[in-house]
Amino acid sequence: MKKLIFLIPLLLLIQPAFGEIIVENDQTYIGNDGILHIVGEIKNDSKSPVNKIKIIATLMDGDGKVLDTIDGKVLTNIIMPGMKGSFDIITNEKKIDNFFNYDLGFEYKLAAPKNQVIEIISSEMKRDQLNNLIISGTIENNGDITANMINVVATLYDRNGKVLTVSKIQTQPDFLRAGEESHFLI
């Protein structure tokens, strides 16, 4: 009986997030280098932030035989409740049959709550003279302390809302004092 009484308070302290973290909007494309990419988003519908997210892609041929297993990461370090995190799994496969499947799994840890204090206050998308897509903008630190190692992630969608590609940059300088702004270019 003492074991059961100990277990009940322990279970109340553990906040489950199973089933509330989902992979959505995933698809594949072949990059300019001929390499297969699997892109998509992870959505956090739990009440807790999650971090240390690892995506596991299992590539299979048309008969279900496993060809390869590849680990990938979400481009952000943490996904806050109600938010999404983009991923781009770059495979080792240059020659893939037209008939292949993949399964996605993931692992994560629950993280301590934190405030979302970095805000994109302006952004613009245009093409340069070589027809490359350029996204530029300004971020602001609305927190009380200096923020370090700030990443800006861009997720591009097709007209049907499917993820086309993702990109990430780290701002320079790599810190932003409270109340200050910084520019980014992706």
Which stretches of residues belong to each language-model region?
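Short acidic/proline- and small/hydrophobic-mixed sequence motifs that coincide with surface turns
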Residues: 48-52, 67, 99, 146-149, ...
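Hydrophobic beta-strand segments
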Residues: 54-57, 72, 151-154, 169
